[in-house]
Amino acid sequence: HHLTANTQSIPHFSTTLNAGSSARKRRSLYLRWGKGSNKIIACVGEGATSVPYQSAEKNDSLYSSTLVKREFPPGFWKDDLIDSLTSSHKVAASDEKRIETLISEIKNMFRCMGYGETNPSAYDTAWVARIPALDGSDNPHFPETVEWILQNQLKDGSWGEGFYFLAYDRILATLACIITLTLWRTGETQVHKGIEFFRTQAGKMEDEADSHRPSGFEIVFPAMLKEAKILGLDLPYDLPFLKQIIEKREAKLKRIPTDVLYALPTTLLYSLEGLQEIVDWQKIMKLQSKDGSFLSSPASTAAVFMRTGNKKCLDFLNFVLKKFGNHVPCHYPLDLFERLWAVDTVERLGIDRHFKEEIKDALDYVYSHWDERGIGWARENPVPDIDDTAMGLRILRLHGYNVSSDVLKTFRDENGEFFCFLGQTQRGVTDMLNVNRCSHVSFPGETIMEEAKLCTERYLRNALENVDAFDKWAFKKNIRGEVEYALKYTWHKSMPRLEARSYIENYGPNDAWLGKTVYRMPYISNEKYLELAKLDFNKLQSIHQTELQDLRRWWKSSGFSKLNFTRERVTEIYFSSASFMFEPEFSKCREVYTKASIFTLIFDDLYDAHGSLDDLKLFSEAVKRWDLSLLERMPQEMKICFLGFYNTFNEIAEEVHKRQGRDMLGHIQNVWEILLAAYTKEAEWSKTKYVPSFDEYIENASVSITLGTIVLISTLFIGEVLTDHVLSKINHGSRFLHLMGLTGRLVNDTKTYQAERGQGEEASAIQCYMKDHPEISEEEALNHVYNVMENALQELNKEFVNNKEVPPNCRRLVFNTARIMQLFYMQGDGLTLSHDMEIKDHVKTCLFIPIA
């Protein structure tokens, strides 16, 4: 109903009088126009109070005498658009069943995780197939591997991963297979086809970027080429490009100090089959892994076994073949890699809530093998890499495990640069991206994280400028899109629903990695993850659309659309809650979060647009006393605000009582009283042109930013009964809530202080700091505020991770409320000017546009 002159139909409010008492009687409160008079009648039950009202048509000074009308951009989202969101996007019953099936199948994937699922490596299988029978007969010890080679040649005559064509990979695998078949004098047809493939395709390697080159290629390929020549295989040995590769190998071998090869484990252990002429086999055995392998490489381990007859090498190969049957992968195990990347994948796709137990089991496993020097792709891998280590550090830390950022020092050189392996200069886009993502989850004083952030940002931005940039370690569907998102929406600006939407579009179910050969990880990249992510996203979006429609109807029926002094931002505000508390079970939490946020916005505009401090103090007193009798003395617009507020929070208080098992209206009143006191103080500052000190300003402004008010009410709906002790850990006196308010206030001020100064508002973090330090410039003050904010965000990280006295969902609510402010004020005032900023695009993708 609309509040319009000369009509009987006016906003109707259902209210509770004396809601704090045990009686909790429900009565009807509403406004109506008195017939033939300029009075509004507030009716409570059978009684009514007449309040004089001057029509705006008869008195143009309505706003000048009470409220100063401020010009705001109109709401961007029109009713017809919101109303058009129909059930056509709702998940059908068949899709609900499919979701259940996919969840069950993915749970089973996690339960089946052992040492790592991966595809065959023709290259490594060829090396294992070379091993002669231990009884001295002229037969292979693993004849099943020879048979696998014979049966798995591709149609073009090559061997290798069939889904991806990489000339380096195919040529390497094909050369290994034709040598093995020649050694066993079998597969003449296959050898002939393989040689033909080599002759016609070898030149393509020259056209591929160096970053496409498999790990250790320049070591193992020339060595095998030399062996092929001895065997008399008809290959184009005189190709200039092949000669260049041989020269690179010779140059690299000269750079390898002999003492380094045997002093400590390095990635050279991964390619010992290509170093046979220089290896001291007795010395190299000191670097054998506990599982009997050499850096988890079947090819390297097979070469060592053929040279030494070491039983542990053979045990490892038997172990791998027992798992895979008649072939081997390019490295194994991959247990840490598989678990970390699977967890990261379901989290980024936004489906992790379905797999909480499975994720905990996976991370418990990783943590049990965590090493302060870093980790590799397998639990007993002696050579840690920055990719697995950074991924582990970030995920384990965010899940509450005690891990130190000092682990990254293993991978930093004397120039402050970060590399994938200790003592090497190799790095790729995906490993630097993982280090960058990790660096944002920093705690105060962790300089190594800041160094990692600067180094990786520089590297990744340079990679984006290079059109031909290709990742060293992975074949990703859209690695460029992943990097662009990560650099633009860093950890404190990336909301879960937005990241899920982006990653669903960038995720490749057929993504592969590049080690010594191309390999795939089916428990990391598969169609099931993607299908579930799409269905789940659309299901949640449908729920959110219905909730948004209800909230907009509430806004209109409450009469707020007639308040000309405030902003209508129902859709943007609802988006702010749905972007992180998106699960179905938090529906009421989202509703309360949105309604509380709307009232803070109305009150903010009310107190900013004041004409009389007495009116504002009256309003604050009415909230404090929860007293309807003060309605008579309020201006008309203030009356609508108070009645809508009064009734809404009486209803909320009743729902809180059901959920928390006690009457908490007093708690709710107190939360609002604290906020309105902060508003009043700011109004007094504004009217007197007072500029407080920086500390005085922050003490008040970290409350007036309203985030604490919103959180302290909506946290009562997270599904847990909260004790007074828990509430004390997130009240306005707590460090956690202060940091949330502080970071929110500072990011707001950095983007709005100039515009507000133009409107006569003198107090901001920047202006107050300049008052304390008159010798500095505005730019210096702004930089100081940014530094304070960044330090506070690091403290907030630590509170979020380590404050175990606060339930996880409470922590999540506080932390993500701080993050949503960083997103909204990324470009400017994203709430007031949302129609001109990317916020409107985020709203569309999160709430309106389903995923096909």
From Swiss-Prot:
It comes from Abies balsamea. This is Bifunctional isopimaradiene synthase, chloroplastic. Involved in defensive oleoresin formation in conifers in response to insect attack or other injury. Involved in diterpene (C20) olefins biosynthesis. Bifunctional enzyme that catalyzes two sequential cyclizations of geranylgeranyl diphosphate (GGPP) to isopimara-7,15-diene. Binds 3 Mg(2+) ions per subunit. Mg(2+) 2 binds at residues 604, 608. It catalyses: (2E,6E,10E)-geranylgeranyl diphosphate = (+)-copalyl diphosphate; (+)-copalyl diphosphate = isopimara-7,15-diene + diphosphate. A motif (DDXXD motif) lies at residues 604-608. Mg(2+) 4 binds at residues 385, 387. One of its GO terms (cellular component) is chloroplast. The keyword Magnesium applies. CDD domains: Terpene_cyclase_plant_C1.
